[in-house]
Amino acid sequence: MPHFKIAHLREQGQNIIIVPLESSFEHKSDEDQRATIAELQVRARGAGLAGTVVPVWQSGGRMYSIAPGPWRSFFQNVSMRSVLLNVNKELYW
């Protein structure tokens, strides 16, 4: 059963569902990454969570994300430590 600890935040007037993933996410194909994000989005909505899913992962001592264009600058200034400190919900199915 998939199980994720997430940070459900409201930033810049938007609900954001930040999902920390394993570093192996970086090595998935673009298609597999999109499928994972879509699945997480459907499951988050099904759990009653409003917002857009943004996956984040650590690689080489740095955090990476796949975020909508307007949020990219926000995520450039966020660390994985900060994300983990803001974990406030769990998503599982």
Model-derived regions: residue spans:
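Short glycine/proline-enriched loop/turn "hinge" motifs that connect secondary-structure elements
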Residues: 8-13
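Polar/charged, Gly/Pro-rich intrinsically disordered segments
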Residues: 56-93
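Short, aliphatic-rich beta-strand segments
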Residues: 16-21
